[in-house]
């Protein structure tokens, strides 16, 4: 869910909570998780692995299909940029009064918000020799051990991972245990894409301009090394990549 102003109302007090389709969001995550995008430590090129471009192309295509503006794929460096235009009108005089270089691209005087996530996944478990990823949903998790892979006898147990205890009754998305799921950060990618689609489908929700950026190679420390600052020119930016719901880190980045 997200919080946004209601269309037609003015002032920061006009807020509404919007609920996304959970099934659609889960399906989006599974679709992205199936694309192998493992980055590689010690490679000077960006992206460090060419497989990351497959997800970049998929996201570019989906952004165009949903109606996002200024969709740009940096094919060489594997960055994806897009814009969800703001719909809070402002007079030409107010726009012209802005001194920054973004004046002509602003649809309104609200701050431009940036949402970013990375497409690559960790190479902590090397899956390059068998890059097929098999995510699946577990509905209404019962709180017990989860058999991920019968053949390999791989189990996900609350005794080993106590955080599972908080997930009883919820829907889990897991793999077959032979690869990482890639929820870091394809969950963030899916959330941004779902939010973009929702806002484009609901023009009655008032919001400022939102810029989107998907990066390669965050897991090897090079996520923003080749970003285009003009394509991601924002007033405030949020990286959708973290732990529990409601967790927020600010003015700090140590990944």
Segments (PLM) and residue ranges:
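Residue-level recognition of conserved structural "scaffold" positions that shape functional pockets
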Residues: 12, 89, 93, 124, ...
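Aromatic-enriched hydrophobic runs in primary sequence
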Residues: 7-8, 27-32, 44, 48, ...
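Acidic/histidine-rich catalytic neighborhood of metal-dependent amide-processing enzymes
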Residues: 164-255
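A near-ubiquitous, low-amplitude feature marking generic local secondary-structure context
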Residues: 12-18, 42, 46, 65, ...
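Intrinsically disordered, low-complexity Ser/Thr/Pro-rich tracts
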Residues: 9-10, 95, 99-109, 196, ...
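Acidic/His- and Gly-rich active-site-bordering loop/insert found
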Residues: 17-171
